[in-house]
């Protein structure tokens, strides 16, 4: 045991050598002692090592081409949107790393600002799924919010802080991890200003929500009620910094294409001007020519648009794309239903004509890829009801007639085993 002094019984820290009089606290172990200063130092070292382990190293951050390739495995089509998202997400997390690791001392300090994303496109074309797949690849907390449920603070509905609460919950209340997550706000076109001119009456679910979202989109220290502000007004708040939270804001923006066409059509006036018909614009990406002035005319306020510098548009899915969605992705619907039938010991097969007929119905209903599952359920419902109760079915074949004419799928009976044939003959 380490002692110090003239015959005294002063104890020393076994690590730094300071006596018990030189420190606030000395903790004894089996034959060793440690002071409070050494404990603090150990804690600091451990925290630094844990922080380094949690941070995604720049070498490990997937490149834009790798992000796009990963998206290709799950999402069919939308190549322009994939490229835009891949670059935006890569630059966003590269910016976070630059802030955490510090900048190269040889370079002049440059502050990298955040670039949130605005996604435009019809319903059922993969906007939400693209964002979900991105979060899955990057292994970051991901939360989805519906803009139509939001209102200004003090009115019936959800506060914008509830969006941040969903992200914190997705991160298992790990605030540090939530601060580098992704928030997807859907139906943002529904909070457009009701008229182009500012109203004297309060628009609490439109322009008011846009105003409330400005700060968290830009980056602020927000106070989030852990159980919802409306029901528990006296609870303690969670502090979260949204500076490094990536916001992907999306909507169908029905009617925006007319605003774009009116503006683009005016350019076709005069000699030598390129004239584009409405049919030509409709067959291409509706929102490829979108400008901030179009979004302002639609009903978004300039400050809101300014915080969404990256614009990615998705297009209507054609028949070929819908057929590919049914069968090609890693978690394609056809593969899912084949697996469900396998669990009952039955093989399931779709003819090529059947897949095309399902795609035709989805286009006719105007539901895009989102409507494919509903059509599959309708087609397979009769056999999914009967199959579990039968043991004489080997295979179910879905044909074009099954989809178009509501004809039952073709059922291929199972051949009886040798023992079953013997029992039957007996």
From Swiss-Prot:
Family matches, as CDD domains: RecA-like_ClpX
GO cellular component entries: HslUV protease complex
InterPro entries: AAA+_ATPase, ATP-dep_Clp_protease_ClpX, ATPase_AAA_core, Clp_ATPase_C, Clp_protease_ATP-bd_su_ClpX, ClpX_bact, P-loop_NTPase, Znf_CppX_C4
Binding site for ATP: 122-129
A biological-process GO annotation: cell division
Oligomeric and partner information: Component of the ClpX-ClpP complex. Forms a hexameric ring that, in the presence of ATP, binds to fourteen ClpP subunits assembled into a disk-like structure with a central cavity, resembling the structure of eukaryotic proteasomes.
Cited PANTHER family: ATP-DEPENDENT CLP PROTEASE ATP-BINDING SUBUNIT CLPX-LIKE, MITOCHONDRIAL (PTHR48102:SF7), ATP-DEPENDENT CLP PROTEASE ATP-BINDING SUBUNIT CLPX-LIKE, MITOCHONDRIAL-RELATED (PTHR48102)
The name this protein goes by in its record: ATP-dependent Clp protease ATP-binding subunit ClpX
